[in-house]
């Protein structure tokens, strides 16, 4: 039986930094630090008085000699290490949102890696689920009723409805909340429950990713509230154009993984 970690949470930021080819930057932990030699997303502890973004800027300048111009919240994770109980805040940095030449200022190694095809090891334990999340495209097209598609650095990524003929060969499967709640067993690499409100959100916290079907203003605002708290897995919002046109920028600035326009969803 696992015991609750009662140590104070240490606030830590890490950057998901991309290059022009859509690859992610990983660096090794330098000698003298816990887990020396393990690979991670660069970052470090948030100091008193710093925002997450300010801490990320400082850490990347100190460790790698590059300047972060813009970063967007993505996922948050809590992880218990032997040396610390950490609250990780991952910030997303696109290729045009940083400048400079990468330097190894702490004697660490660094490497550009493709989502789904990471070639460096060992990885820091807190990052295992994160690597799976990175393979999910941030741009998806389609309909919840017929399936979603996108591209990652490894190629085509298809998400099939549970009852479709393609669900056994898809990258992920969509599952109605009622079926998820009943514990329906699905043979698939990944299962994404479809939810419609904040109450259901609380019941899907062990999912690989979650699709939130937004059909009204109340649900749209609930998404904003949940994103403000931080999400631990990729959240994909599906909504009709009337909702997307109003909320897309706000959702994206707060850390939604993808916004899908689905006009089969009737606004109510």
Spans of model-derived segments:
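Conserved N-terminal beta-strand and adjoining loop/helix that marks the start
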Residues: 2-24, 45
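Conserved hydrophobic/aromatic beta-strand scaffold that supports enzyme active sites
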Residues: 16, 26, 88-92, 112
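Conserved Nudix-box catalytic region and its N-terminal flanking loop in Nudix hydrolases
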Residues: 23-62
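A short coil-to-beta-strand element that immediately follows conserved catalytic motifs
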Residues: 67-76
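Active-site-adjacent beta-strand/loop module that shapes the phosphate/pyrophosphate-binding cleft
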Residues: 77-101, 116, 127
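Nudix hydrolase/Nudix homology domain
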Residues: 103-160, 236, 253-261, 265-268
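Short loop-to-alpha-helix "cap/lid" segments that border enzyme active sites
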Residues: 149-153, 163-268
């Amino acid at each position: 039986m696992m015991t609750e970690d009662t140590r104070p949470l240490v606030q830590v930021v890490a950057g998901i930094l991309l290059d022009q080819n859509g690859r992610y930057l990983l660096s090794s932990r330098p000698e003298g630090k816990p887990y020396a030699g393990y690979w991670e997303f660069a970052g470090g502890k948030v100091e008193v008085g710093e925002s997450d973004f300010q801490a990320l800027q400082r850490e990347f300048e100190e460790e790698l000699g590059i300047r972060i111009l813009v970063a967007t919240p993505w996922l948050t994770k809590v992880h218990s290490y032997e040396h610390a109980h950490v609250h990780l805040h991952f910030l997303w940095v696109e290729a045009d949102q940083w400048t400079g030449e990468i330097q190894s200022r702490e004697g660490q190694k660094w490497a550009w890696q493709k989502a789904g095809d990471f070639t460096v090891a060992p990885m820091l334990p807190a990052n295992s689920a994160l690597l799976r999340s990175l393979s999910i495209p941030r741009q998806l097209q389609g309909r919840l009723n017929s399936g979603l598609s996108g591209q990652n650095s490894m190629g085509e990524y298809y998400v099939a409805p549970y009852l479709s003929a393609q669900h056994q060969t898809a990258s992920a499967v969509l599952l109605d909340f009622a079926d998820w709640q009943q514990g329906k067993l699905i043979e698939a690499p990944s299962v994404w429950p479809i939810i419609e409100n904040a109450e259901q959100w609380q019941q899907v916290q062990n999912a690989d990713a979650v699709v939130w079907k937004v059909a009204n203003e109340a649900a749209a605002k609930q998404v904003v509230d949940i994103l403000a708290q931080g999400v631990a897995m990729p959240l994909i919002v599906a909504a009709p154009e009337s909702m997307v046109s109003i909320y897309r920028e706000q959702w994206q600035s707060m850390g939604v993984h993808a916004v899908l326009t689905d006009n089969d969803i009737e606004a109510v």
